[in-house]
Amino acid sequence: MSKNKDISVVSPNAALVEASGVPALLDQIRPAWKAKSLISRVQRLVSVDPSSACQRLLNAAIHDLKEKVVIAGLDIAGEAAKKHKLPSVDNAEDIENYSTAKIIDLAYRMGLLSRPEWRRVARCYEIRRDLEHEDDEYEAGVEDCVYIFKTCIEVILQKDPIHLLKVTDVKEIVE
């Protein structure tokens, strides 16, 4: 076989995923994330392997969520973690080491995700865990892929980070 020829096997679900509006959803991602190679990889994969594309998109959303937790404030993250018996947060590295399930919980406990958003993102993670095992017990359908795309983009990747005021900032202004 020649090295110059690319072979791509298109998933039978790829056309359905594209027809369901996923490419239009990808246009809603914030420019800061659209510029990243991970999102361009997702755009290329959608038409070939939607299951892998949605796994990568969820990875991007979780990374974005971690960044948003740090931007919102490590002091708030630390308090929320302590109050809700999550792993302690003292610095940004602690957030990087948080598991996916725990970062979803922490973002909810900090108020970065509403309860319905938290449930949707947690469900996406559950679907992705099922996909990772790639066993015969569960196979992602078109609806699962579309759900992950829609949730990750609408709940996380299209929203700008929230900059919260800190008590120390207010004290400095008052003084």
Regions found by a protein language model. Give the residues of each.
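Amphipathic alpha-helical interface elements
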Residues: 2-123, 138, 161-175
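Generic detector of isolated residues embedded in canonical secondary-structure elements
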Residues: 59, 127-130
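Elongated scaffolding segments in large macromolecular assemblies
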Residues: 129-175
